[in-house]
Amino acid sequence: LAARYGHKYIYMGGHRDDYPQVITSRFPIENMKRITGNGQDSIVTHGAGWARIRFNGKQLNIVTLHTWPQRYSFGIPKEEREVSKAANGGDKYRRMEMEYICKETIAQSGNAQNEYWMMMGDFNAKSRSDNSFYNWPEDTTAFLVHDYSHQNTPYIDVIKEKYPNEFFTTTGGKTRIDFFYCTEPLYKAI
């Protein structure tokens, strides 16, 4: 498929199930890390990946991800799921996945704010930056995933930055759960 549009290189991020993330490129892709977690407390349910592409003397770090989609936490027995939902277990689990992914990728660089990094995928989470459209309480756990990214990484939400007064759904409904982040040097090149 990638060859149809001139891409002869393919990369598949880490995945534990049938939901992998795939990127294609005209340039060789180096696998930096396939991320699935390292135990019950840090399982990345649908996986993530860190790939690197070098071109024209530049180095582009690409992080792909797909976090847990349910309202209850991952690994919860069926009979305990309603309790987990009531405690916002899914939001808290996704936040753990985001922290783990960031620590395994962009946090590995001591100079990420000056490098080309992008992170994209199905976050299955809403962002506080869209709350003017949601009008949710400021203390909702629904924002935990993106709060972590905004507070602990140099990533910029590309869509929100480019179109600050607009809202773009990614679900066909009234939510945005798919995001594209990048660092400032890459953002300036867009």
Language-model features, listed with the residues they occupy:
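Sec-exported extracytoplasmic/periplasmic mature domains
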Residues: 2-6, 29, 103-110, 128
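Metal-dependent phosphoester-hydrolase catalytic domains
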Residues: 54, 107-118, 124-190
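Extracytoplasmic/periplasmic, Sec-exported soluble proteins
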Residues: 12-16, 41-43, 86-93, 172
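Structured beta-strand-rich core segments of catalytic domains in phosphoester-bond hydrolases
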Residues: 1-72
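Glycine-rich, phosphate-binding/catalytic loops in enzymes
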Residues: 2-5, 41, 79-80, 134-139
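A long, amphipathic alpha-helix that forms part
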Residues: 87-113
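Active-site metal-binding loops of divalent metal-dependent hydrolases
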Residues: 67, 122-123
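A solvent-exposed, charged loop/short amphipathic helix patch at secondary-structure junctions
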Residues: 72-92
